[in-house]
Design a protein with these regions (language model features):
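NUDIX/MutT-family hydrolases
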Residues: 85, 94-125
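Active-site-adjacent beta-strand/loop module that shapes the phosphate/pyrophosphate-binding cleft
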Residues: 13, 60, 70-92, 102
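Conserved N-terminal beta-strand and adjoining loop/helix that marks the start
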Residues: 1-18, 38
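Short secondary-structure junctions
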Residues: 56-63
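Hydrophobic packing within well-folded, soluble alpha/beta domains
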Residues: 12, 45-54, 66, 84, ...
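Generic C-terminal helix-cap and adjacent flexible tail
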Residues: 1-2, 126-130
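Conserved Nudix-box catalytic region and its N-terminal flanking loop in Nudix hydrolases
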Residues: 17-55
Length: 130
């Protein structure tokens, strides 16, 4: 089975809400996920996260701490997703690749249709984040 390794940014604001994005393309169109993407050869997870967030959201983040790694078997591939708690370094965000986005409080995390791998991250967030 094909293996894909990605990083995901769990971007939090001052109120503890997390930033979620809705896919606008492909088989999983309209499902929600945490922004991020594939690591390139020679990149650290932190470098990959900063690059992906610049590409997807036209903003800068600080990578604050490792949260969890999720392994999930999709029908076509095995996904390994390394998730990091992050903060915005600027106030501007622009959706370059997603059709929608929203800030979700801990209580609102169940209100969107998450991609299967991201469901596991939501469970970790609910249990670990105050």
């Amino acid at each position: 089975m094909k293996q894909i390794e990605v990083v995901a940014a769990i971007i939090r604001d001052e109120e503890g809400c997390v930033f979620a994005t809705q896919r606008g393309y492909g088989e999983w169109k309209d499902w929600w996920e945490f922004p991020g993407g594939k690591m390139e050869a020679g990149e650290t997870p932190e470098e990959a996260l900063k690059r992906e967030i610049r590409e997807e959201l036209s903003t800068e983040i600080s990578v604050d701490e490792f949260l969890c790694t999720v392994d999930y078997d999709y029908p076509q591939f095995h996904l390994t997703m390394h998730c990091y708690l992050c903060s915005l370094m600027t106030d501007s965000l622009h959706l370059n690749e997603h059709e929608a986005a929203k800030w979700l409080s801990k209580d609102e995390l169940g209100n969107v249709k998450w991609l299967p791998a991201d469901v596991k991250v939501v469970e970790v967030i609910k249990s670990k984040i105050q």
